[in-house]
Amino acid sequence: MGSSSGQSGYDLSFKILLIGDSGVGKSSLLLSFISSSVEDLAPTIGVDFKIKQMKVRGKRLKLTIWDTAGQEKFRTLTSSYFRGSQGIILVYDVTKRETFLNLADIWAKEIELYSTNHDCIKMLVGNKVDRESERKVSREEGMALAKDLNCLFHECSARTRENVNGCFEELALKIMEVPSLLEEGSSSVKRKPDYRAHQGRCCSS
């Protein structure tokens, strides 16, 4: 469920999904948020997840953050993890334009196909802004695409940790503002069948 008693150590539990091409820094972004260390990581095989507890506006939050593989061969495996997500972060590499273009061409369509929460909060995140001299996607382009896809927008650097916390904190805040997401809960094990699964889509085109 989305809420919990004090015995569990948190008030609200959210499921957040990280998606995007392989190599854009999804795993590094997650590691940077979870801990203070950042490493050069091998591509994720299938799906991994981490749990982070934080306090936002007086509420104790438990974030279960799923890190999905970006390679096409894992696409069918990761599609099931869209189910029940209250927040989805679409990550691209500001130094690789193809990863940006694929957000609309591939990843937004994946959300439309597989997400069961039509009210889920989406965020576009441009990673690797520490490599400014290699930038191939302007901030203005990122903001424009985010507007087109009805997403929040941030740029950050997993390596320097610049604005990493800000991304997750704003996403959590926006989820907290949507009553249907709080009622939905984030547990795919204990949830009731989602009768709305075919009635709404999370991502507008």
Curated annotation (Swiss-Prot):
Which molecular function GO terms apply here? GTP binding; GTPase activity
Lipid attachment points (S-geranylgeranyl cysteine): C202, C203
User: Which topology term describes how it sits in the membrane?
Assistant: Lipid-anchor
Intervals of motif Effector region: 41-49
Q: Where does GTP bind?
A: 20-27, 67-71, 127-130, 157-158
Give the record's GO CC terms.
plasma membrane
Name the Pfam families for this protein: Ras (PF00071)
Cellular compartment(s): Cell membrane
Q: What is its main location?
A: membrane
Q: Does the keyword Methyltransferase apply?
A: no
Kindly give the SMART domains that the UniProt entry links to this protein. Answer: ARF (SM00177), RAB (SM00175), RAN (SM00176), RAS (SM00173), RHO (SM00174)
Q: Which GO terms describe its biological process?
A: protein transport
UniProt keyword list:
Cell membrane, GTP-binding, Lipoprotein, Membrane, Nucleotide-binding, Prenylation, Protein transport, Transport
| Role of this protein | Intracellular vesicle trafficking and protein transport.
Family indicated by similarity: Belongs to the small GTPase superfamily. Rab family.
List the protein's name. Answer: Ras-related protein RABC2b
Gene designation per UniProt: RABC2B
